[in-house]
Structure formats: structure tokens, C-alpha cells
């Protein structure tokens, strides 16, 4: 009787663990499908509002954003054609802007448009602290770049759509220069999914053995706090080249 009872308890525990594992992650494509691609940029539809989506930029004001380690909004950014864009600085890294709020589990959506040779990125799980000069010292990056016209030779993990210096894109669904691309990022616990123009380009599990091996054998070995934080700000990177960002939306999971 004790043996039977013990087996039943083990079975219940296994069932609970399996169910917990399944419920801990959401379907990124289902979240992606909640957005209306035909909606007017920088607005939320009633359906999106019902699903819990927030608008992080209305195309007119910089409310909700500030310069990294600054109190206000930096002069090297401006709003042009209802989009955030940079005042170019000759290709040199400059002041990134970050969300005022911090996020742990979320879905993030933004449209971006590249100029020739442009370089930028969406960096997340950022710690804001004067001891760091740039957001990329702590946060992973969804790479945004015109790698075709970038002057230096790049590795696959540095190309458009990559999880920068970690995971190369599995597909290359890029739009031509001057056209809007749609970037979608889901961070759900340790599970990260990057979608570009309707196609999943990167999926990985943070803190997995594979992730740790990549982190400890590449660029980030010299950045001890990179990937350390599970909650943080989201950044639009300013690499001194011109990129437009609009239609920025977020859903807390």
C-alpha cells in the first residue's frame, strides 16, 4: 500500500512539474498574432488594448524615454516623420536611449528602417548604473544593421537579426533599404524569441549550458555583468548612423 501511495505521489509531482514548465512560457507566435499590422503607426487598436498592449511612443513626444545614465532626453536623438531617429555622429557610438520603466517578462514590437551602412540594435535587461558606459555591457542585443554595406567584415553572430555575439539568425527575411522592417522580441523567463518580418530568426534559453558556453568563449567574457540581470530597461542603440524607429509597443507577460 505504501508503495502504491508513493507512486501516486510521484505521479502527481511529475504532472505538476510538467504543467508548470508548460505554463511558464507563452507561444511567441500567438503573441505576435495579437498585433494588427494594418493599424495606423504609433497607435493601439481596441483589440490590442484589450490584450494588454501598451504604446511606448506616440510619434510626437519622447515621454517614457531618457538617455542612458542621463536625467533627460539626449540632443543626439530627435523625432522625425513620427519616428525616433539619430543625429548622426560619423559612425561612432553615442548616447543610447532607454525606457524609463524596467521589464522582466514581456513582448516588444517595433518597426525600423535602415539607411546604407546603418548600425543599431534593441538591447534589453539593461542595468542603468554610472559604472557602465553603454547598455550593451549588461544587456543582450537584437542586432539591427545593414551588414551588406558595413565597412568591416562581420561574423554571422553580428549580422542583422542576430542575438549579437551569441546566436546567428536562422533566416534572413530582410526588407530592402528604405523599407520598414518589423522586429518582435519575446522574453519569457529564460526563454527568448526574436522574430523579424514574420519569421523566427533566433530562439535560445538563457542560462542553459549552451548559452553559458557561448558567453564564456566570446565577446562577453570580458563583460562580467553581461546577461546577469533578468529585469531591466530596453534600449534603442545609437551607433552614430541613421535608423528610424516607430510603432513601439510592449506587453507585460
Predicted regions span which residues?
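Carbohydrate-interacting regions of secretory-pathway proteins
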Residues: 22-253
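Bacterial Sec-dependent N-terminal signal peptides
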Residues: 1-25
Amino acid at each position: 500500500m505504501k508503495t502504491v501511495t508513493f507512486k501516486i505521489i510521484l505521479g502527481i509531482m511529475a504532472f505538476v512539474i510538467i504543467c508548470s514548465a508548460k505554463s511558464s512560457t507563452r507561444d511567441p507566435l500567438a503573441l505576435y498574432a495579437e498585433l494588427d499590422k494594418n493599424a495606423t503607426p504609433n497607435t493601439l487598436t481596441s483589440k490590442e488594448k484589450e490584450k494588454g498592449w501598451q504604446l511606448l511612443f506616440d510619434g510626437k513626444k519622447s515621454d517614457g524615454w531618457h538617455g542612458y545614465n542621463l536625467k533627460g532626453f539626449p540632443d543626439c536623438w530627435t523625432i522625425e516623420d513620427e519616428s525616433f531617429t539619430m543625429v548622426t555622429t560619423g559612425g561612432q557610438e553615442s548616447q543610447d536611449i532607454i525606457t524609463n520603466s524596467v521589464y522582466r517578462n514581456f513582448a516588444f514590437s517595433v518597426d525600423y528602417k535602415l539607411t546604407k551602412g546603418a548600425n543599431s540594435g534593441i538591447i534589453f535587461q539593461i542595468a542603468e548604473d554610472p559604472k557602465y558606459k553603454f547598455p550593451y555591457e549588461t544587456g543582450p542585443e537584437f542586432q539591427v544593421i545593414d551588414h551588406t554595406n558595413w565597412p568591416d567584415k562581420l561574423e554571422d553572430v553580428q549580422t542583422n537579426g542576430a542575438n549579437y555575439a551569441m546566436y546567428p539568425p536562422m533566416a534572413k527575411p530582410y526588407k530592402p533599404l528604405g523599407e520598414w522592417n518589423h522586429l518582435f522580441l519575446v522574453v519569457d523567463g529564460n526563454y527568448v524569441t526574436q522574430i523579424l518580418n514574420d519569421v523566427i530568426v533566433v530562439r535560445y534559453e538563457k542560462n542553459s549550458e549552451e548559452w553559458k558556453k557561448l558567453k564564456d568563449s566570446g565577446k562577453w567574457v570580458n563583460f562580467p555583468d553581461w546577461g546577469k540581470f533578468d529585469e531591466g530597461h530596453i534600449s534603442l542603440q545609437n551607433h552614430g548612423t541613421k535608423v528610424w524607429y516607430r510603432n513601439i509597443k510592449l506587453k507585460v507577460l
